[in-house]
């Protein structure tokens, strides 16, 4: 076990070498414990963070994995250590089976062991064996009968053992983690959150527990509540908030602030550098995101983690040469990683070779059918191929994997809109706006949907919400003007059209032309001839000369002549 989250300091007083020593020792302890339990991804994360600390700061810190506090005086821990010593030989045998992926054999070997470490490895082996079997039973992709949350047959046994242990007062953090995993898989998120919070309070640098906690959180409100129940100054609480904000696609200034604080302790952390790139991507600053990802890849040339997101950035920027190079690099590193297949799929999509793109996204899902982005991207490709049925199926499966992914909900809305099923589309756009409340695109799509079903008041509210993201979207302002005109609210319509004209930068756009012609008619109706003439002259002085504007100008001049008679 490790020093608790409550006893660890945050980022205040970073000059204090004792704090850095404590963080370093906890990371070393976590690496040791997770390695013994076969939690390889947690080991990798902790090792990367350890190497992300400033070497200058570490020179004065002695190599030690002994935890701080009165760990050795805990009588329960002393008894636990005694059991581990007694079971060491059989544990090493079981761990060797586990490392060879003989999970059932490992579990069987440990069936009579009593230490928490042995019980964890036995139950974790059972869990992985059950996951493997459920995968084998559902190998066919895009089968309408496929349920991605197919039940792991070992869940009942694992739950029964864990509940008995918790009833007996066993608070081993790794067993708490396993309980959280099982409850999350069974879609009992509130219970999962409770167990995972207890786990991270006891083992704060155990990253796998934080990942599971993030997967159990489906909204920014829930995230805020969970974080408020954890020590706010602890560095792991801050890192978790950054990661969970990205997973929820809810990036705010608080996430950037917490990331900056973490970077003070881990200035060389590649993980944190990647988190900054991901936050920048979520903020839709694609040029900056590209620069950050390029720097990451330069310093870590064999990295594949999150490089699929880098390929998304290059796709949006339509940078075919860089995306093609990235696909070649990824393929040379490991052609059987889901990230590699996704990168290649994005490359073919950018070349408009959508059938090839689908092939690679399917390949990614054959390697990991819970690989969320591939389901969503495959849905996009099916839309391009006009295969709406397959697109809907892909998006639905994406939602099954992760209900907080706004892209899948948005994709469903767009697909049903193509099918002119606007009430269905409305529901999915509403889900997308709930997950992405500050994204102009979501509200614009919702407003358009309300227009299609003849609900102008709701459309106006949606478009106005979209404008909170940017007051300079001329197409939204024109739509608002049209809606107000339909409702006979001409003053509000005029206000929208005037705002539209203010968005104009250099050249006159089709939207501002329409706005000027409408305003000219409006001023003409009020006999404000000079103002009407001014709007029309601005249209005619532009690059586009419209017959409608010319005709209106002739009418205006005729009226002006009669008014002087």
From Swiss-Prot:
PROSITE patterns, A to Z: TPR, TPR_REGION
Disulfide bridge positions per record: none
Stored InterPro entries: APC8, TPR-like_helical_dom_sf, TPR_rpt
Keywords: Cell cycle, Cell division, Mitosis, Repeat, TPR repeat, Ubl conjugation pathway
Residue ranges of the TM segments: none
Highest taxon of source: Eukaryota
TPR repeat spans: 87-120, 173-206, 270-303, 338-371, 373-405, 407-439, 440-473, 475-507
Coiled-coil positions: none
GO CC annotation terms, alphabetical: anaphase-promoting complex; mitotic spindle pole body; nucleus
Signal sequence, renumbered to the chain: none
GO BP term, pick one: protein ubiquitination
Function noted in UniProt: Component of the anaphase-promoting complex/cyclosome (APC/C), a cell cycle-regulated E3 ubiquitin-protein ligase complex that controls progression through mitosis and the G1 phase of the cell cycle. The APC/C is thought to confer substrate specificity and, in the presence of ubiquitin-conjugating E2 enzymes, it catalyzes the formation of protein-ubiquitin conjugates that are subsequently degraded by the 26S proteasome. Has a role in promoting metaphase to anaphase transition via the ubiquitination of specific mitotic substrates.
Quaternary organization: The APC/C is composed of at least 13 subunits: apc1, apc2, nuc2, apc4, apc5, cut9, apc8, apc10, apc11, hcn1, apc13, apc14 and apc15.
The protein's name: Anaphase-promoting complex subunit 8
Protein source organism: Schizosaccharomyces pombe (strain 972 / ATCC 24843) (Fission yeast)
UniProt lineage: Eukaryota, Fungi, Dikarya, Ascomycota, Taphrinomycotina
Gene this chain is encoded by: cut23
